[in-house]
Amino acid sequence: MTTAARPTFEPARGGRGKGEADLSQLSKQYSSRDLPSHTKIKYRQATQDAPEEVRSRDFRRELEERERVAVREKNRDRPTREHASSVSKKPRLDQIPAANLDADDPLTDEDADDDSDEDSDDDTAALLAELEKIKKERAEEQARKELEQKAEEERIRMENILSGNPLLNLTGPAQSVAAFKVKRRWDDDVVFKNCAKGVDEMKKDKRFVNDTLRSEFHKKFMEKYIK
């Protein structure tokens, strides 16, 4: 059974809890963000370019020393590379004297490589020529399509101009004259139209009658739908 409906005989009163002897005393709870965080000055260490270290260093001497080390390393690697390149080089066919050539001697691998290189160069040239031809054909096709599109747009524009202006409409005399007839408004034959105007302003073939049964609209309606 719930105890939510029971009356409170002893309500809570402030000043009697733990740490609440004096209500006028300020709270002693602090947040960690209210406390001072940086309480010590950080000094530069020995390897962080302190002003004393910068004054005592000789930058020119250090730069010259680094340059000498780089040149020494470069010269150390150069003879090995030159030796390897000289060993890898083989005498070409055109460099061999004619006296050393023999008809029975087979061609070396380098000659075969030269032939294959020439064949590959020819194939590459043929492929490049074919690619240029394809690009040229595509460019011509694109230009032709653009010209056709422009011509079609110009034709549609001229048709719209000629059909929109009756003075420039050159479709021929077979066109009906009814196309130039101005349409009447839907409220031209209503009863109470232009009631405030005078009788002289109205047309002679129309007369205003302030009677629904004797009006022109009622007569037309009866003749059209009843008779």
Curated annotation (Swiss-Prot):
Residue stretches in coiled coil: 121-165
Family in the record: Belongs to the CWC15 family.
InterPro entries named in the record: Cwf_Cwc_15
Any single Pfam family the record assigns to this protein: Cwf_Cwc_15
A single Gene Ontology CC term: nucleus
Polar residues composition-biased segments: 24-34
Listed Basic and acidic residues bias regions: 52-84
Signal peptide: none
Domain of life: Eukaryota
Protein name: Protein CWC15 homolog
Binding partners and assembly: Identified in the spliceosome C complex. Component of the minor spliceosome, which splices U12-type introns.
Keywords: Coiled coil, mRNA processing, mRNA splicing, Nucleus, Spliceosome
Entry annotated with the keyword Nucleus: yes
Region (Disordered): 1-130
Compartment(s): Nucleus
Residues passing through the membrane, by range: none
Disulfide cross-links: none
Function: Involved in pre-mRNA splicing as component of the spliceosome.
Keyword field contains Nucleus: yes
Composition-biased stretches (Acidic residues): 102-124
